Amino acid sequence: MTSDKHLFVLIHGLWGNYTHMESMRTILSTTLKKEDVNDDMIYFLPKQNAMFKTFDGIEIIGYRTLIEVCEFIRDYKDGKITKLSVMGYSQGGLVARFMIGKMLTEFKELFEDIEPQLFITMATPHLGVEFYNPTGIAYKSALYSALRTLGSTILGKSGREMFIANSSNNILVKLSQGEYLEALSLFKWRIAFANVKNDRTVAFYTAFITDCDPFIDFDNKLKYTFEEKIPGSGYKGILPKIVDLNALNVNSHAPTKPTKTYKKWGRTILIILVATFLILPIALVMNGLGTAYSYIVTCKYRKMLSNGILHNEVRGKLGLTEQLKGYVTDAYGSIINSALDMDANYEASNSNLVNEEELPWKEFIQKYTTINDGVWKSKFKKLPFDENRKVILRNLNKLKWIRVPIYIKAVNAHGVIVARRGMDENTAATGIACIEFTAQLLAYLMHKSN
């Protein structure tokens, strides 16, 4: 006799592919099995939105992902799927929010007997992407202006949507309303992980869903205070470094690093020169080509979206008309390899910490469900949000979230938060600890839900 199953969908981010979520799946599977909640778990990593396809905009990416999930559920024969959890990494968190909105409305008959459980985002720009410069440093203002223009241009429809460039690219506002917000509210738990530093793609405030960012406010010079008692056990290396926001002190700055040697300066300058004159031009050309190609091949689907008929087409045979299926199966080709990711890591200190006194999960969850109303916010200025971001923030804050401010010591914390390049001896220990903590938190919540 087959048992009821819990489907866990893991969705990758911009410029990525499904392998970016393999490390997370591995740790989840191992941890949940150890906690006796893995027997009925099945994991699904959508594969049809790789590389340039992530430029196509949230709606088209979301429909493609929904098609894959629908087909998987339709064809699954080893039991009845009765529960659903979703994890989205970076842009994948936005795609996930679109997907569940359509899943529980336009495809309600397929999902009406499936109970939403956990919804998790890892470094997701819920409030879009915007660069703020409260310190007023002139070169940063010029740099941010250039990055804003580039980001909303060379990243295709997705880039314009991330920056909420205009009223025709306001999908992030829509995702905070109506069917999307209602679907999100049906999940028993919503969890948002946010990097406090070293994430050059998604700033803390937008991943944490807040209008206050101490790390931008003080140009990342604040001294961090970490939670001393971390729930969970069996961490292989160090404990995860979760920042105690309420303990941040505006008068306590991180110690200044010693002056670099000439050798280190030379190496840094060499890296900058290589990035500026070799990697950046290649990336710009490839992104430009990807943007152009994305615009051409998705034009007809955008017309279907604007005419309100795409969802009807998708519904046919679980969403596969010949036109759309042709697009879903069309391959752009991977012409940029992972070497351009530049995801070098540093080893963290304190590699043999022992979690001698565990903080009960209940206490941790209570604190970090209400952390956005904590005393820390009174110490720092509000960011100057435009009206769109104010609306998104207000709507998303109607729901309860467990928000985790995580510190990862790595050059590219954005990639390491899910170990998207895999886990080996070179993976930052703080990144592995973050993934282990995530898995243990989810295991506890699943136990609690049961």
Swiss-Prot record:
Pfam families per UniProt: DUF676
A molecular function GO annotation: monoacylglycerol lipase activity
Transmembrane regions: 269-289
Free-text function comment from the UniProt entry: Phospholipase involved in maintaining the lipid droplet morphology. Has phospholipase activity with broad substrate specificity, acting on glycerophospholipids phosphatidylethanolamine (PE), phosphatidic acid (PA), phosphatidycholine (PC) and phosphatidylserine (PS), primarily at sn-2 position. It can later remove fatty acids from the sn-1 position of the produced lysophospholipids such as lysophosphatidylethanolamine (LPE). Also shows activity toward phosphatidylglycerol, but, in contrast to what was observed with the other phospholipids tested, prefers the sn-1 position.
Family recorded in the similarity comment: Belongs to the putative lipase ROG1 family.
Note: Present with 1210 molecules/cell in log phase SD medium.
Protein name: Lipid droplet phospholipase 1
Source organism (scientific name): Saccharomyces cerevisiae (strain ATCC 204508 / S288c)
